[in-house]
Amino acid sequence: MQIQVGSQNPTKIQAVKEMFPNIDVIGVQAESGVSAQPFSDEETKLGAITRAKYCAMNNPYTIGVGLEGGVMYIDNELYLCNWGALVTPENDIITASGARIKIPNDVEEGLLKNIELGELMDTYAEKKDVSKKEGAIGIFTNQLITRKEMFRHVVTLLKGQWMLLNSNNH
């Protein structure tokens, strides 16, 4: 059995490796099928599912995992959102969402000008490759939660549902 993560981003791959330490986990290039900067829960979730499906279809013994970050409005305020999907070799689709945090107004302004969050965060934090390290969540929480930890939480939710699906208790 192998798990393919639909991304080459090290934070996403490491989050999956930590939750599945006894399974071979690799990252593969997988298109999300959504915009480069998803702007709703629905679009972000769809991106995760599309990535996971792509990975699962490559091999009958492969679990596909898709992890997607996006933004969404709640009551006219923009929030960071993230979704994960796990697709089994039997084509069962499991989904989960994680942390949400309000995005500062100056970052929101950049997003509304069609600048991707990853690019904005490098400028906002005056750092390079924030999306491959602590992520926006790391910057916005003063490093208390990193992008890897945020995605690890989502992968934990996916793994728990997958374990239940494979148990005799459902």
UniProtKB/Swiss-Prot annotation:
The lineage of its organism: Bacteria, Bacillati, Bacillota, Bacilli, Bacillales. Binds 1 divalent metal cation per subunit; can use either Mg(2+) or Mn(2+). GO terms for biological process: nucleotide metabolic process. PANTHER family: NON-CANONICAL PURINE NTP PHOSPHATASE_PRRC1 DOMAIN-CONTAINING PROTEIN, PTHR34699. The keyword Ion transport does not apply. Belongs to the YjjX NTPase family. It comes from Oceanobacillus iheyensis (strain DSM 14371 / CIP 107618 / JCM 11309 / KCTC 3954 / HTE831). Mg(2+) binds at E31. Its cofactor is Mg(2+); Mn(2+). The keyword Nucleotidyltransferase does not apply. Its EC number is 3.6.1.73. Gene3D superfamilies: 3.90.950.10. It holds the Pfam family NTPase_I-T. This is Probable inosine/xanthosine triphosphatase. Homodimer. Keywords: Hydrolase, Magnesium, Manganese, Metal-binding, Nucleotide metabolism, Nucleotide-binding. It comes from the Bacteria. It catalyses: XTP + H2O = XDP + phosphate + H(+); ITP + H2O = IDP + phosphate + H(+). Phosphatase that hydrolyzes non-canonical purine nucleotides such as XTP and ITP to their respective diphosphate derivatives. Probably excludes non-canonical purines from DNA/RNA precursor pool, thus preventing their incorporation into DNA/RNA and avoiding chromosomal lesions. GO terms for molecular function: ITPase activity; metal ion binding; nucleotide binding; ribonucleoside triphosphate phosphatase activity.
